[in-house]
């Protein structure tokens, strides 16, 4: 069905007692498509922005543990070229971004399935980089979204998917290189879809993953990126070697997101998977001497991400390796290791953080302060107050930031504060600590991920 006219959006809805009864009376997908908005006054010869947009499932039945893709299509049904934002279809950390699809999944009893997405660290919603798509009249654009990123279909049964998207459409002007400006219309798609999950055997599941494993042999192109997303979202014991190989591949040869491969190993969660992450953290996949100049920063960034995962896991078995790498690691993984030490809540880690507060390197002192903040203990308050006397201005600012985060107090340290002003702020903190320290409970940071 379609609604025609300026800024018109219509959708019919049929009430039903059971969430699945509606599918007995009309097609499985409740499709909303619209043709909306003329540019200028509605007169003959004026180009019209018109579209048809919908979600659909590729199959009615899937095996338990199998990747489930929901397809989004938009067709330019008008006479005006339009553009819209586009990126590789993977779930964004920020759910409030305007162009992103939204999925909610319920079981046969109407219960919402748990959302497996990680909570934004420290409340940050992250950023997303978009490209753009130019869609001439008559052409269709298609995206495949992996539904397993929004729900874990762990049990056989019937499920209902509510899929929704409101995509801003921009007028395309060949004389202008960018597509900035207000939308001329919004492509709205709202669909109710149903699927069934059937029991699976290990052999069936391994067969279902073979196309993705074969695609990853190419290590390039959007198909390989989609295959890696599948393995990282739904890791299986038989995908361990492939994920480990992708994570440890030299930067110049990878062509794929190695951090995503590390996430897949962490999500798999076996002892062997975590050992592979530890190897990356220790730099055992270091770039060869004749690698490109950009390789070492990329390797350092990858090592730092592996260290972060180890910290989020918080297993004391990883702690000796992190402590061992502190003296020799380069700045990026070393800084991540110091911050991660606070996540272990272990006396050995705490001692290393307190000792590093006396490091001659200001960056080390900054990261030690952040590590103590991650510890989330009132015992670190005196040491953090002492950082307000540090000779480095950044250390003082980060120290005050950590104190605010631990206590909830709004004692401010002005930007570019002089040592004298910092000392005044330190005196305010000392007064607060003497008055309330005995009864104070530190504010705990929620975990970013539960590996």
Residue ranges, per PLM feature:
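Low-complexity, acidic Ser/Thr/Pro/Gly-rich terminal tails and inter-domain linkers that flank the onset
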Residues: 45-63
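Asparagine-centered strand-capping/turn motif at beta-strand->loop junctions
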Residues: 74-78
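Internal, hydrophobic beta-strand segments that form the core of beta-sheet-rich folds
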Residues: 141-171
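Short beta-strand elements
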Residues: 172-209
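Amphipathic alpha-helical scaffolding segments comprising HEAT/armadillo-like alpha-solenoid repeats
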Residues: 202-213, 236-250, 270-293, 315-327, ...
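Short inter-helical turns and helix N-cap capping residues of alpha-solenoid HEAT/ARM repeat scaffolds
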Residues: 220, 251-254, 285, 299, ...
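Residue-level detector of extended alpha-helical repeat arrays and alpha-solenoid scaffolds
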Residues: 224, 254-258, 300-303, 334, ...
């Amino acid at each position: 069905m379609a609604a025609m006219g300026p800024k018109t959006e219509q959708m019919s809805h049929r009430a039903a007692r059971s969430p699945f009864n509606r599918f007995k009376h009309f097609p499985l997908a409740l499709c909303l498509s619209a043709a909306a908005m003329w540019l200028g006054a509605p007169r003959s010869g004026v180009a019209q922005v018109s579209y048809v947009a919908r979600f659909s499932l590729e199959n009615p039945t899937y095996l338990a543990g199998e990747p489930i893709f929901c397809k989004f299509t938009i067709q330019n049904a008008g006479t005006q070229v339009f553009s819209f934002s586009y990126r590789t279809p993977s779930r964004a950390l920020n759910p409030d971004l305007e162009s992103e699809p939204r999925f909610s999944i319920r079981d046969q009893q109407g219960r919402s399935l748990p959302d497996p997405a990680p909570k934004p660290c420290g409340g940050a919603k992250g950023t997303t980089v978009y490209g753009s798509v130019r869609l001439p009249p008559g052409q269709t654009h298609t995206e495949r979204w992996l539904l397993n990123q929004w729900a874990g279909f762990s049990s056989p049964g019937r499920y209902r998917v509510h899929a929704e998207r409101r995509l801003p459409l921009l007028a395309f002007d060949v004389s202008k290189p960018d597509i900035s400006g207000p939308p001329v219309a919004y492509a709205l798609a709202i669909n109710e879809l149903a699927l069934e999950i059937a029991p699976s055997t290990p052999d069936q599941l391994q067969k279902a993953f073979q196309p993705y494993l074969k695609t990853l042999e190419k290590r390039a192109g959007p198909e390989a990126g989609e295959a890696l997303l599948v393995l990282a979202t739904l890791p299986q014991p038989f995908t361990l070697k492939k994920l480990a190989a992708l994570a440890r591949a030299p930067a110049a040869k990878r062509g794929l997101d190695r951090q995503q491969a590390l996430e897949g190993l962490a999500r798999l969660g076996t002892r062997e998977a975590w050992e592979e992450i530890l190897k990356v953290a220790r730099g055992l996949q270091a770039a060869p001497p004749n690698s490109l100049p950009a390789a070492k920063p990329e390797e350092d960034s990858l090592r730092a991400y592996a260290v972060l995962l180890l910290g989020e896991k918080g297993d004391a078995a990883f702690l000796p390796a992190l402590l061992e790498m502190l003296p020799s690691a380069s700045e990026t993984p070393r800084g991540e290791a110091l911050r991660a030490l606070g996540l272990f809540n272990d006396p050995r880690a705490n001692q290393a953080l307190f000792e590093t507060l006396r490091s001659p390197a200001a960056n080390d002192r900054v990261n030690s302060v952040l590590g103590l903040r991650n510890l989330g203990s009132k015992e670190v308050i005196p040491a953090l107050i002492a950082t307000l006397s540090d000779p480095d201005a950044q250390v003082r600012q980060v120290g005050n930031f950590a104190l605010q985060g631990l206590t909830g107090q709004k004692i401010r340290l002005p930007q570019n504060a002089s040592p004298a002003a910092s000392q005044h702020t330190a005196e305010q903190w000392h007064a607060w600590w003497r008055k309330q320290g005995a009864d104070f409970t530190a504010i705990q940071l929620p975990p970013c991920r539960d590996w």
